[in-house]
Curated annotation (Swiss-Prot):
The reaction(s) this protein catalyses: XMP + L-glutamine + ATP + H2O = GMP + L-glutamate + AMP + diphosphate + 2 H(+)
Annotated gene: guaA
Protein name (database record): GMP synthase [glutamine-hydrolyzing]
Source organism of the structure: Fusobacterium nucleatum subsp. nucleatum (strain ATCC 25586 / DSM 15643 / BCRC 10681 / CIP 101130 / JCM 8532 / KCTC 2640 / LMG 13131 / VPI 4355)
Active site per database record: 82, 169, 171
Chain ranges of the GMPS ATP-PPase domain: 196-387
EC code(s) of this entry: 6.3.5.2
Length: 512
């Protein structure tokens, strides 16, 4: 970690990444680490402040996540959020219990200390976001209440020990002045300095890549997605044609994707790119397979084999570059208790054993919005930088059931129309992810005077901040009608279209 930033201890909160992003938006470096990180390792980072995240546990329960009390003995400013406030109270001799009236959602915060530095320029009453079933019932000695709601103690402090805490979540947008409250802690109490910008990141990363790689060769699997594209541009800036990108056309890509990627990089960068057409190979392996997990494994295994074959042809290649980003790293760290690994990400710890390369991950400290900023700084066109996420297995998991060339071609055309219309209506950048799913279901229709018996497709569009929870996009009816008319009239093979209005949870954004 860069020294002099903010350390966020993760107790299993769904908002831990959001806290870090909020701090970084202020121009201050923030890093998320597991709550059980060794205190000496935390102190070695020389943090200006420490934030304790929320979490789903109860501090009084057996085996609940806790902290080494030593952390509170160094006079480093500490801010506890939700579970963090309850833990601070519990460890300092106060009491926490199940609340008779639990608080989930918006609540009115009233300040007890209007002049407190945390509430500088904050009105006496404001709306905050609560999400807790436990509450503080008895204050710890030497702590005082600085804000409350109708049903709970909402903020506390022990200024002598430099410890502060909120029962609510200032990091979420529903907390009206939450960003300013965090800002007051970061700059007013922790005295952090602005030390984080994408311009500085590019400069320092280019220098590090040059020093580490020297005159050796680097290979990178270019997918056309944002992360691998930005990683390629950043490494190319550092070492030029010592980088070779391998683009594998699996036959499961979006319409004209291979052509677009090759054109963008030919026009904007002096870069070695090998485009491998492996469509027939992938579709042959997928023939007859309907189980989604099996499809994922086949596509992943085949991709590695194709990549491996091509990588061996590049003389002097000692580094394998990947577009791993910070959320991949956070989600792949095993945290005891509440945050057991959420998922083993394909970019983290997933190297095949026979690929004897050193790993180069120039984006592993960045969130997705920061990756996009770096991409723009490096000259990647907006339409590439702002592309919606596309899964590694591609259309293989957007075609439910068996994958065939016919189905892939049908889905490609339908998806291209949906995306084209979203762009025309200036809606593309207002939704987080949009795509079409092809179902293994046929239904009767009428085209002209003839009966048809063709596939059903689904439009899926979701809005989200962190992709861990999501709502369906409330697209205008007139827009949906236009998309429906175009797909049903222009795409041979689809005669029925539906719109997915499921939120995550309980559904996921992708169908497989």
């Amino acid at each position: 970690m860069k020294k002099g930033g903010i350390v966020i201890l993760d107790f299993g909160s769904q908002y831990n990444q959001l806290i870090a992003r909020r701090v970084r938006e202020m121009g201050v470096y923030a890093e998320v680490v597991p709550f059980h990180e060794d205190v000496d390792k935390i102190l070695a980072r020389e943090p200006k402040g420490i934030i304790l995240s929320g979490g789903p546990a109860s501090v009084y329960a057996e085996g609940a996540p806790s902290l080494d009390i030593k952390l509170f003995q160094n006079n480093i400013p500490i801010l506890g959020l939700c579970y963090g406030m309850q833990l601070i109270t519990h460890l300092h001799g106060g009491k926490v219990a199940r609340a008779d009236k639990q608080e989930f959602g918006k609540a009115e915060l009233e300040l007890d200390d209007k002049n407190h530095i945390l509430y500088k320029n904050i009105p006496n009453k404001t709306t905050v976001w609560m999400s807790h079933g436990d509450h503080v019932t008895e204050m710890a000695p030497d702590f005082k209440i600085i804000a409350h709601t109708d049903s709970s103690i909402a903020a506390i402090e022990n200024s002598d020990k430099n410890i502060y805490a909120f029962q609510y979540h200032p990091e979420v947008t529903h907390s009206q002045h939450g960003f300013d409250m965090l800002k007051n802690f970061i700059f007013g109490i922790a005295k952090a300095e602005k030390n984080w910008s994408m311009e500085n990141y590019i400069e320092s990363t280019v220098k590090q890549i040059k020093e580490r790689v020297g005159n050796k060769q680097v290979i990178l699997g270019l997918s056309g997605g944002v992360d691998s594209s930005v990683a390629a541009a950043l490494i190319n800036k550092a070492i030029g044609r010592q980088l070779t990108c391998i683009f594998v056309d699996t036959g499961l890509l979006r319409k004209d994707e291979a052509k677009q990627v090759m054109e963008v990089y030919a026009k904007n960068f002096d870069m070695n790119i090998k485009c491998i057409n492996a469509e027939e190979r992938f579709l042959t392996k997928l023939a007859g397979v309907t189980d989604p997990e099996t499809k994922r494994k086949i596509i992943g295994k085949e991709f590695v084999e194709v990549f491996n074959e091509e990588a061996k042809k590049i003389e002097g290649a000692e580094f394998l570059a990947q577009g791993t980003i910070y959320p991949d790293v956070i989600e792949s760290v095993s945290v005891k208790g509440p945050s057991v690994t959420i998922k083993s990400h394909h970019n983290v710890g997933g190297l095949p054993e026979d690929l004897k390369f050193e790993l180069l991950e120039p984006l592993r400290e960045l969130f997705k919005d920061e990756v996009r900023k770096v991409g723009r700084e490096l000259g990647i066109p907006d339409y590439m930088v702002d592309r919606h996420p596309f899964p590694g297995p591609g259309l293989g998991i957007r075609i439910l059931g068996e994958v065939t060339k016919e189905k892939a071609d049908i889905l490609r055309e339908a998806d291209a129309i949906f995306i084209e219309e979203l762009r025309k209506a200036d809606l593309y950048n207002k939704v987080s992810q949009a795509f079409v799913v092809l179902l293994p279901v046929k239904s009767v229709g009428v085209m002209g005077d003839e009966r048809t018996y063709e596939y059903t497709a689904v439009l899926r569009s979701a809005n989200t901040i962190d992709f861990m929870t999501a709502t369906w996009s409330h697209l205008p009816y007139e827009f949906l009608e236009k998309v429906s008319n175009r797909i049903l009239n222009e795409v041979k093979g689809i005669n029925r279209l539906t719109y997915d209005i499921s939120s995550k949870p309980p559904a996921t954004i992708e169908w497989e």
